[in-house]
């Protein structure tokens, strides 16, 4: 009988944290996922340790547990993890790990990540550019514009979209939005999906119209329209909490459109 069969099931934060220190790689991977899925803040320190655990390495050179620990830390959004995540950026053997770390830092949103991320962008070594540019957009590092503009002509269309997303958020110029919208009709299904997620991150009225017209499953449209709606409503709540609520006509119209579109899509599912 294998160790996985004999192991206790992970049903509590304590069991998941204990499993991270075990020997079974599959169980340790699942434990990291479980802690992130359930946003167990008590698991932050254990996940930071797992971020540097090199015991689980696949033949191609990647570190699955370390990647999953990074993703889980992003889900926790705990600023205490930032120093460990920044240190993990130094791993050069696994760009998949670096990508997961960059995404986690973007989710946490701590400004301490800005300098090391800009350093990666300026490096002459290959980087997970899509995640890196998206993180700089999320953190609103607008000073990186001169370094990011050339990526509009990168060989990867997904990297091009990330650069267009960054530049649209900075300038609101429609040509950058159009670069993303064009990919909604791409022959590659995954590029269409990536484009729709990029549009949802922008939350623009034209992005809503483009998503509704896109050649993607209704379930994917619904997911991303809900993301835009939640972003707009969260902004309203934030303004109310600060006593500054003043919703403009454009936002009101977009919210009404989103509610109607979501209702229509739910009926069609």
Swiss-Prot record:
Pfam families given in the database record: HEAT_2, HEAT_PBS
Role, per record: An enzyme involved in the biosynthesis of bilin.
Annotated Gene Ontology cellular component terms: phycobilisome
Domain of life: Bacteria
InterPro entries in the record: ARM-like, ARM-type_fold, PBS_lyase_HEAT
Gene Ontology molecular function: lyase activity; oxidoreductase activity
Keyword Lyase found: yes
Family in the record: Belongs to the CpcE/RpcE/PecE family.
Membrane spanning residue stretches: none
Organism: Mastigocladus laminosus (Fischerella sp.)
Statement: the UniProt record of this protein carries the keyword Transport: no
Protein's name according to its UniProt entry: Bilin biosynthesis protein PecE
Keywords: Antenna complex, Lyase, Phycobilisome
GN (gene name): pecE
């Amino acid at each position: 009988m294998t160790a996985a069969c004999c192991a206790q099931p992970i049903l509590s934060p304590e069991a998941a944290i204990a499993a991270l220190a075990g020997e079974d790689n599959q169980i340790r991977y699942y434990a990291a996922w479980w802690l992130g899925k359930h946003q167990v803040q008590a698991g932050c320190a254990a996940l930071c340790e797992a971020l540097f655990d090199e015991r689980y390495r696949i033949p191609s050179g990647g570190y699955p547990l370390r990647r999953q620990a990074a993703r889980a830390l992003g889900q926790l959004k705990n600023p205490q993890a930032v120093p460990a995540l920044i240190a993990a950026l130094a791993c050069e053997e696994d760009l998949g790990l670096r990508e997961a770390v960059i995404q986690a830092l973007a989710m946490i949103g701590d400004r301490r990540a800005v300098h090391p991320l800009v350093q990666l962008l300026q490096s002459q070594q290959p980087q997970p550019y899509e995640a890196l540019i998206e993180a700089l957009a999320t953190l609103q590092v607008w000073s990186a514009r001169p370094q990011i503009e050339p990526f509009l002509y990168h060989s990867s269309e997904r990297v091009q979209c990330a650069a267009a997303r960054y530049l649209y958020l900075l300038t609101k110029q429609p040509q950058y939005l159009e670069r993303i919208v064009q990919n909604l009709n791409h022959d590659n299904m995954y590029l269409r999906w990536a484009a729709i997620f990029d549009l949802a991150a922008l939350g623009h009225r034209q992005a809503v119209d483009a998503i509704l017209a896109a050649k993607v499953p209704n379930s994917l449209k619904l997911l991303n329209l809900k993301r835009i709606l939640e972003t707009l409503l969260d902004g309203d709540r934030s303004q109310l909490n600060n006593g500054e609520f003043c919703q403009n006509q454009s936002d009101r119209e977009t919210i009404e459109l989103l509610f109607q579109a979501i209702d229509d899509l739910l009926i069609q599912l």
